Amino acid sequence: LVTVTHLRAPGMSWGRLPIFVWSVIAASILAFTFTQFFAAAMLMITLDRIAGFSFFNADKGGAPLLYQHIFWFYSHPAVYIFVLPGFGITLEVLAHFSRKPLFAYRWAVAGLLGIVALSGVVWAHHMFVSGMPTWLHAPFLVSTEVISVPTGFVFLSALGTIWMGRIWLRTPMLFALGVVFNFMI
């Protein structure tokens, strides 16, 4: 984040950054924000195992479900930490091998940042059968559906980029088309 903020080329505004750079910014924000929850869970489980604490040990009054919440609160955004740079690479490859500029650049950036904004509120869809209160099912179901909107912005940009392009079918382009196809089905 600091590198992009302070060491951009002279005259390069935020609106002219390559989409791959935006995808790395998005992944970096997620890593910076959510990794500390994983570290806290690891510290708590270490204290349970070594020092006799009982954060997660039900026999001693701990809450095993708390570990599951903390685990998924980190692990679901971690999926996006891994996939967002891949989205950026895919969009760059599609633009290059379609011989066109990226379609709807600002919408693609908004999609990447929208995924970042929503990724912290979808973790509990992994926990519908683990004892979570029933009244929480609907909000997490809705958040799971809503996160598809910014993802749709990213893939609309991908499809718009290849539309009417002079497509050059080489190995990177075939791989990028495979990524788009897999995320669209």
Predicted regions and their residues:
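...captures the hydrophobic TM-helix bundle architecture rather than a specific catalytic motif
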Residues: 1-185
